Amino acid sequence: MAAVALPLLLLLASLVTPTPARDPFAPQLGDTQRCQQRCRQHHPGSPPAQPEPEGPSESPNNKAILISACERGCRLFSICRFVAKSSRPNATETECEAACTEAYVKAAEQRACSEGCWGQIPEPETQLEQKDLALDPPRGRLSLRYLFSMLCSDLMSSAQGFLSSSWTYSLQTDNRKVVVFQTQPVAENFAFQGSHLQRVEVTWRRSHPKALELHMDPVGPLDKVRKAKPRVKTSKAKVESEDQQESDFLSCMSRRSGLPRWVLFCCLFLSILIMLWLSCCTLVTTPGQHLKFQPLTAEQHKGLLVESDWPLYPPLPPPAYEDSTPPYKLKLDLTTL
Protein backbone atom coordinates (compact mmCIF):
# COMPACT_ATOMS: atom_id res chain seq x y z
CA MET A 1 0.00 0.00 0.00
CA ALA A 2 2.85 2.37 0.82
CA ALA A 3 4.49 1.58 -2.52
CA VAL A 4 1.32 2.71 -4.30
CA ALA A 5 0.82 5.84 -2.18
CA LEU A 6 4.37 7.15 -2.70
CA PRO A 7 4.06 7.65 -6.51
CA LEU A 8 0.66 9.30 -6.00
CA LEU A 9 2.13 11.76 -3.51
CA LEU A 10 4.99 12.56 -5.89
CA LEU A 11 2.51 13.14 -8.72
CA LEU A 12 0.38 15.47 -6.57
CA ALA A 13 3.48 17.37 -5.47
CA SER A 14 4.53 17.88 -9.09
CA LEU A 15 1.06 19.17 -9.96
CA VAL A 16 0.92 21.55 -6.99
CA THR A 17 4.36 23.05 -7.78
CA PRO A 18 3.71 26.55 -9.18
CA THR A 19 4.97 27.27 -12.66
CA PRO A 20 7.12 30.37 -13.22
CA ALA A 21 5.18 33.42 -14.35
CA ARG A 22 5.81 34.33 -17.95
CA ASP A 23 6.28 37.92 -19.07
CA PRO A 24 3.00 39.08 -20.72
CA PHE A 25 4.95 41.44 -23.01
CA ALA A 26 7.20 38.71 -24.39
CA PRO A 27 5.50 38.76 -27.85
CA GLN A 28 6.22 42.50 -28.19
CA LEU A 29 9.61 42.84 -26.48
CA GLY A 30 10.92 39.31 -26.88
CA ASP A 31 11.59 36.68 -24.24
CA THR A 32 14.18 37.80 -21.66
CA GLN A 33 14.10 34.65 -19.50
CA ARG A 34 17.09 33.11 -21.28
CA CYS A 35 19.14 36.29 -20.88
CA GLN A 36 18.24 36.57 -17.19
CA GLN A 37 19.22 32.94 -16.67
CA ARG A 38 22.62 33.66 -18.21
CA CYS A 39 23.01 36.59 -15.84
CA ARG A 40 22.33 34.35 -12.83
CA GLN A 41 24.79 31.75 -14.11
CA HIS A 42 27.48 34.36 -14.72
CA HIS A 43 26.95 35.92 -11.26
CA PRO A 44 26.02 33.00 -8.96
CA GLY A 45 23.93 33.89 -5.95
CA SER A 46 20.27 34.28 -5.01
CA PRO A 47 19.31 37.89 -5.69
CA PRO A 48 16.64 39.49 -3.52
CA ALA A 49 13.67 41.26 -5.05
CA GLN A 50 15.22 44.51 -6.40
CA PRO A 51 17.55 45.52 -3.52
CA GLU A 52 18.25 49.12 -2.64
CA PRO A 53 21.35 50.51 -4.40
CA GLU A 54 22.32 52.48 -1.27
CA GLY A 55 22.70 49.42 0.91
CA PRO A 56 25.96 48.15 2.38
CA SER A 57 28.54 46.99 -0.14
CA GLU A 58 28.84 43.37 1.04
CA SER A 59 29.65 40.51 -1.26
CA PRO A 60 26.13 38.93 -1.48
CA ASN A 61 24.48 42.31 -1.86
CA ASN A 62 27.03 43.31 -4.51
CA LYS A 63 26.29 40.12 -6.46
CA ALA A 64 22.58 40.81 -6.22
CA ILE A 65 23.08 44.34 -7.55
CA LEU A 66 25.17 43.03 -10.45
CA ILE A 67 22.52 40.43 -11.29
CA SER A 68 19.83 43.13 -11.17
CA ALA A 69 21.91 45.36 -13.46
CA CYS A 70 22.47 42.49 -15.89
CA GLU A 71 18.75 41.65 -15.98
CA ARG A 72 17.95 45.32 -16.51
CA GLY A 73 20.38 45.32 -19.43
CA CYS A 74 18.35 42.49 -20.97
CA ARG A 75 15.16 44.53 -20.62
CA LEU A 76 16.84 47.71 -21.90
CA PHE A 77 18.00 45.91 -25.04
CA SER A 78 14.46 44.66 -25.69
CA ILE A 79 12.99 48.13 -25.07
CA CYS A 80 15.56 49.79 -27.36
CA ARG A 81 14.83 47.33 -30.12
CA PHE A 82 11.05 47.81 -29.68
CA VAL A 83 11.31 51.61 -29.63
CA ALA A 84 13.74 51.96 -32.53
CA LYS A 85 11.96 49.27 -34.59
CA SER A 86 15.32 48.21 -35.96
CA SER A 87 16.47 44.70 -36.76
CA ARG A 88 20.18 45.61 -36.66
CA PRO A 89 21.66 44.17 -33.45
CA ASN A 90 24.79 46.34 -33.55
CA ALA A 91 22.88 49.63 -33.50
CA THR A 92 20.54 48.39 -30.77
CA GLU A 93 23.50 47.17 -28.71
CA THR A 94 25.14 50.60 -28.94
CA GLU A 95 21.93 52.26 -27.76
CA CYS A 96 21.58 49.78 -24.90
CA GLU A 97 25.17 50.41 -23.74
CA ALA A 98 24.53 54.16 -23.84
CA ALA A 99 21.42 53.65 -21.70
CA CYS A 100 23.41 51.54 -19.22
CA THR A 101 26.05 54.26 -18.98
CA GLU A 102 23.39 56.84 -18.14
CA ALA A 103 21.50 54.56 -15.75
CA TYR A 104 24.44 53.46 -13.58
CA VAL A 105 27.40 55.32 -12.12
CA LYS A 106 29.68 52.50 -10.96
CA ALA A 107 31.83 50.78 -13.56
CA ALA A 108 30.94 47.28 -12.31
CA GLU A 109 27.21 47.94 -12.64
CA GLN A 110 27.71 49.44 -16.11
CA ARG A 111 29.70 46.38 -17.13
CA ALA A 112 27.01 44.02 -15.80
CA CYS A 113 24.31 45.98 -17.60
CA SER A 114 26.32 45.83 -20.83
CA GLU A 115 26.66 42.06 -20.37
CA GLY A 116 22.87 41.90 -20.22
CA CYS A 117 22.72 43.83 -23.49
CA TRP A 118 25.11 41.36 -25.09
CA GLY A 119 23.19 38.37 -23.74
CA GLN A 120 19.86 39.56 -25.17
CA ILE A 121 21.13 39.75 -28.77
CA PRO A 122 18.91 37.29 -30.68
CA GLU A 123 20.49 34.40 -32.48
CA PRO A 124 19.95 33.96 -36.23
CA GLU A 125 17.76 30.89 -35.73
CA THR A 126 15.60 32.73 -33.21
CA GLN A 127 15.21 35.64 -35.61
CA LEU A 128 14.15 33.31 -38.41
CA GLU A 129 11.59 31.63 -36.14
CA GLN A 130 10.18 35.00 -35.11
CA LYS A 131 9.92 36.07 -38.75
CA ASP A 132 8.16 32.83 -39.64
CA LEU A 133 5.72 33.30 -36.77
CA ALA A 134 5.07 36.90 -37.81
CA LEU A 135 4.46 35.95 -41.43
CA ASP A 136 2.35 32.90 -40.62
CA PRO A 137 -1.36 33.91 -40.72
CA PRO A 138 -3.73 32.59 -38.04
CA ARG A 139 -5.22 29.24 -38.83
CA GLY A 140 -8.75 28.08 -38.27
CA ARG A 141 -12.11 29.61 -38.93
CA LEU A 142 -10.80 33.18 -39.09
CA SER A 143 -8.15 32.58 -41.74
CA LEU A 144 -10.38 33.62 -44.67
CA ARG A 145 -11.61 36.74 -42.88
CA TYR A 146 -8.03 37.53 -41.90
CA LEU A 147 -6.89 37.39 -45.52
CA PHE A 148 -9.75 39.63 -46.67
CA SER A 149 -9.10 42.12 -43.88
CA MET A 150 -5.39 42.25 -44.67
CA LEU A 151 -6.15 42.86 -48.34
CA CYS A 152 -8.55 45.70 -47.54
CA SER A 153 -6.11 47.12 -45.00
CA ASP A 154 -3.32 47.27 -47.56
CA LEU A 155 -5.58 48.99 -50.07
CA MET A 156 -6.95 51.50 -47.59
CA SER A 157 -3.61 52.27 -45.94
CA SER A 158 -2.11 53.32 -49.26
CA ALA A 159 -4.91 55.89 -49.70
CA GLN A 160 -5.21 56.94 -46.06
CA GLY A 161 -1.52 57.03 -45.16
CA PHE A 162 -1.62 60.49 -43.66
CA LEU A 163 -3.87 59.41 -40.78
CA SER A 164 -2.06 57.89 -37.83
CA SER A 165 -2.61 57.29 -34.13
CA SER A 166 -0.38 56.19 -31.32
CA TRP A 167 -1.57 53.71 -28.70
CA THR A 168 -0.42 53.71 -25.09
CA TYR A 169 -0.84 50.60 -22.95
CA SER A 170 -0.47 50.69 -19.16
CA LEU A 171 -0.58 47.26 -17.52
CA GLN A 172 0.45 45.86 -14.15
CA THR A 173 2.09 42.44 -14.08
CA ASP A 174 2.08 39.86 -11.31
CA ASN A 175 5.54 40.86 -10.03
CA ARG A 176 4.40 44.42 -9.19
CA LYS A 177 5.66 46.07 -12.34
CA VAL A 178 3.67 48.64 -14.27
CA VAL A 179 4.90 48.84 -17.85
CA VAL A 180 3.78 51.49 -20.31
CA PHE A 181 4.13 50.93 -24.06
CA GLN A 182 3.15 53.07 -27.00
CA THR A 183 3.85 53.06 -30.71
CA GLN A 184 5.59 56.43 -30.61
CA PRO A 185 9.36 56.30 -29.94
CA VAL A 186 8.85 56.68 -26.18
CA ALA A 187 8.65 53.74 -23.78
CA GLU A 188 8.19 53.95 -20.04
CA ASN A 189 8.87 51.32 -17.42
CA PHE A 190 7.91 51.40 -13.73
CA ALA A 191 10.25 49.15 -11.74
CA PHE A 192 9.46 48.16 -8.14
CA GLN A 193 12.40 48.67 -5.77
CA GLY A 194 11.79 47.77 -2.16
CA SER A 195 8.86 49.84 -0.92
CA HIS A 196 9.21 52.55 -3.56
CA LEU A 197 8.21 52.74 -7.17
CA GLN A 198 10.68 54.04 -9.73
CA ARG A 199 9.79 55.37 -13.17
CA VAL A 200 12.16 54.60 -16.04
CA GLU A 201 11.60 56.47 -19.30
CA VAL A 202 13.49 55.72 -22.50
CA THR A 203 13.24 58.41 -25.20
CA TRP A 204 14.42 58.06 -28.77
CA ARG A 205 15.54 61.18 -30.64
CA ARG A 206 14.77 61.35 -34.34
CA SER A 207 17.38 64.00 -35.08
CA HIS A 208 20.21 61.89 -33.66
CA PRO A 209 19.75 58.22 -34.56
CA LYS A 210 22.30 57.02 -31.99
CA ALA A 211 21.09 59.22 -29.13
CA LEU A 212 19.02 57.45 -26.50
CA GLU A 213 17.86 59.21 -23.35
CA LEU A 214 17.06 57.34 -20.15
CA HIS A 215 15.43 59.16 -17.22
CA MET A 216 14.80 57.61 -13.81
CA ASP A 217 12.71 59.42 -11.21
CA PRO A 218 10.98 58.06 -8.09
CA VAL A 219 7.21 58.14 -8.08
CA GLY A 220 6.64 57.74 -4.34
CA PRO A 221 5.95 55.08 -1.71
CA LEU A 222 4.11 52.02 -2.87
CA ASP A 223 1.39 52.48 -0.25
CA LYS A 224 0.30 55.73 -1.88
CA VAL A 225 0.27 54.27 -5.36
CA ARG A 226 -2.98 52.60 -6.24
CA LYS A 227 -3.15 49.42 -8.16
CA ALA A 228 -2.96 50.52 -11.76
CA LYS A 229 -5.82 49.39 -13.96
CA PRO A 230 -5.26 48.53 -17.60
CA ARG A 231 -6.10 51.57 -19.63
CA VAL A 232 -5.67 52.59 -23.22
CA LYS A 233 -5.11 56.14 -24.41
CA THR A 234 -5.01 57.45 -27.94
CA SER A 235 -3.30 60.52 -29.32
CA LYS A 236 -3.10 61.87 -32.85
CA ALA A 237 0.25 62.45 -34.50
CA LYS A 238 1.65 62.91 -37.97
CA VAL A 239 4.42 60.44 -38.71
CA GLU A 240 5.76 58.82 -41.81
CA SER A 241 3.84 56.00 -43.38
CA GLU A 242 6.69 53.56 -42.65
CA ASP A 243 6.32 54.05 -38.88
CA GLN A 244 2.56 53.70 -38.83
CA GLN A 245 0.79 50.83 -37.14
CA GLU A 246 -2.96 50.34 -37.32
CA SER A 247 -3.35 53.54 -39.35
CA ASP A 248 -5.52 52.25 -42.15
CA PHE A 249 -9.04 53.37 -42.98
CA LEU A 250 -10.82 50.54 -41.15
CA SER A 251 -8.88 51.12 -37.92
CA CYS A 252 -9.56 54.86 -38.05
CA MET A 253 -13.28 54.29 -38.59
CA SER A 254 -13.32 51.68 -35.83
CA ARG A 255 -11.75 54.10 -33.35
CA ARG A 256 -14.08 56.95 -34.33
CA SER A 257 -17.31 54.93 -34.37
CA GLY A 258 -16.55 52.50 -31.56
CA LEU A 259 -17.56 49.50 -33.67
CA PRO A 260 -15.31 46.47 -34.08
CA ARG A 261 -13.18 46.29 -37.15
CA TRP A 262 -14.74 43.08 -38.44
CA VAL A 263 -18.23 44.65 -38.32
CA LEU A 264 -17.08 47.54 -40.52
CA PHE A 265 -15.39 45.11 -42.88
CA CYS A 266 -18.57 43.00 -43.19
CA CYS A 267 -20.67 46.12 -43.87
CA LEU A 268 -18.25 47.29 -46.55
CA PHE A 269 -18.14 43.86 -48.17
CA LEU A 270 -21.94 43.48 -48.13
CA SER A 271 -22.44 46.95 -49.59
CA ILE A 272 -20.14 46.09 -52.49
CA LEU A 273 -22.06 42.86 -53.10
CA ILE A 274 -25.40 44.70 -53.03
CA MET A 275 -24.14 47.29 -55.54
CA LEU A 276 -22.99 44.55 -57.90
CA TRP A 277 -26.31 42.72 -57.51
CA LEU A 278 -28.31 45.87 -58.24
CA SER A 279 -26.28 46.62 -61.35
CA CYS A 280 -26.76 43.08 -62.67
CA CYS A 281 -30.50 43.13 -61.89
CA THR A 282 -30.89 46.46 -63.68
CA LEU A 283 -29.34 45.05 -66.82
CA VAL A 284 -31.57 41.97 -66.74
CA THR A 285 -34.92 43.55 -65.82
CA THR A 286 -34.74 46.64 -68.05
CA PRO A 287 -37.15 46.32 -71.08
CA GLY A 288 -35.61 46.27 -74.52
CA GLN A 289 -35.17 49.57 -76.33
CA HIS A 290 -35.30 48.15 -79.88
CA LEU A 291 -37.76 49.75 -82.40
CA LYS A 292 -40.19 47.34 -83.96
CA PHE A 293 -41.38 48.28 -87.51
CA GLN A 294 -44.98 47.31 -88.33
CA PRO A 295 -46.34 47.00 -91.92
CA LEU A 296 -48.41 50.03 -93.06
CA THR A 297 -51.82 49.86 -94.73
CA ALA A 298 -52.84 51.61 -98.00
CA GLU A 299 -54.45 54.53 -96.16
CA GLN A 300 -51.32 55.03 -94.08
CA HIS A 301 -49.25 54.94 -97.28
CA LYS A 302 -51.40 57.69 -98.85
CA GLY A 303 -51.04 59.85 -95.78
CA LEU A 304 -47.29 59.48 -95.85
CA LEU A 305 -46.97 60.46 -99.53
CA VAL A 306 -45.94 64.08 -99.92
CA GLU A 307 -45.71 65.98 -103.18
CA SER A 308 -42.19 67.09 -103.73
CA ASP A 309 -40.97 70.19 -105.56
CA TRP A 310 -38.78 68.20 -107.83
CA PRO A 311 -39.91 65.46 -110.20
CA LEU A 312 -39.52 62.00 -108.94
CA TYR A 313 -38.43 60.84 -112.42
CA PRO A 314 -36.50 62.71 -115.14
CA PRO A 315 -38.73 64.34 -117.86
CA LEU A 316 -39.36 62.20 -120.89
CA PRO A 317 -38.31 63.60 -124.28
CA PRO A 318 -41.18 64.57 -126.69
CA PRO A 319 -42.14 61.85 -129.09
CA ALA A 320 -40.50 62.09 -132.47
CA TYR A 321 -42.87 62.27 -135.53
CA GLU A 322 -41.89 61.06 -139.00
CA ASP A 323 -41.81 63.58 -141.90
CA SER A 324 -45.05 63.56 -143.94
CA THR A 325 -46.11 65.17 -147.20
CA PRO A 326 -47.50 68.70 -147.02
CA PRO A 327 -51.31 68.91 -146.85
CA TYR A 328 -53.37 69.37 -149.95
CA LYS A 329 -54.65 72.88 -150.82
CA LEU A 330 -58.30 72.85 -151.55
CA LYS A 331 -59.95 75.58 -153.58
CA LEU A 332 -63.27 76.16 -151.99
CA ASP A 333 -64.45 78.49 -154.85
CA LEU A 334 -64.45 75.67 -157.26
CA THR A 335 -66.23 73.27 -155.10
CA THR A 336 -69.94 72.85 -155.45
CA LEU A 337 -72.06 71.55 -152.71
UniProtKB/Swiss-Prot annotation:
Residues 45-54 have a biased composition (Pro residues). It is a single-pass type I membrane protein. Glycans are attached at N90. The chain crosses the membrane at residues 263-283. InterPro entries: Uncharacterised_TMEM59. GO terms for cellular component: Golgi membrane. GO terms for biological process: branching involved in ureteric bud morphogenesis. It is found in: Golgi apparatus membrane. A motif (Microbody targeting signal) lies at residues 335-337. Residues 36-62 are annotated as: Disordered. Keywords: Glycoprotein, Golgi apparatus, Membrane, Signal, Transmembrane, Transmembrane helix. The keyword Membrane applies. Its main location: Golgi. The keyword 4Fe-4S does not apply. Pfam families: BSMAP. Residues 1-21 form the signal peptide. Modulates the O-glycosylation and complex N-glycosylation steps occurring during the Golgi maturation of APP. Inhibits APP transport to the cell surface and further shedding. Belongs to the TMEM59 family. This is Transmembrane protein 59-like.
